[in-house]
Amino acid sequence: ASNDSSNMIVEARMAMYLQRLRYGSSAVSHSDALRWATRGSAAVLGRQDIGEIAVGKQADLALFRRDDISFAGSHDPLAALLLCNAQRADCVMIGGHWRVLDGAIPDLDLPRLIARQREQAAALVARLN
């Protein structure tokens, strides 16, 4: 079984909940889980160029809108990332280049991509049958 959602926020939330279940709710904070997802992941990969926002690092950022209903009433923006269902970043910078703006990938032909994925999925299912 796998919980790989390709969503680092969801994975950090699950890691936090699993650790809280095992060690108690006060043993692990949202800051711990975010540190695992950033600096911790970089350390596991042996990467010095990622894991934090600092001069000389990759400049990878994910920005989330907090005016969505899912964040209503949140008082701690970092806790809200994990606890208020942050599903989709509004803007994403990778290596210093904006790759997602206003929730969309610039110049992506989404209908074409969806059609191609459906074709490939159908071909895979046909091969399995």
Region spans (language model):
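Active-site core of metal-dependent hydrolases
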Residues: A1-S6, R20-V28
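Interfacial and helix-entry/exit segments of alpha-helical transmembrane bundles
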Residues: S25-A37
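Amphipathic alpha-helix from the class-I
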Residues: Y17-G24, G46, V100
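Histidine/acidic-residue-rich catalytic or RNA/ligand-binding cores of hydrolases
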Residues: D4-Q19, D76
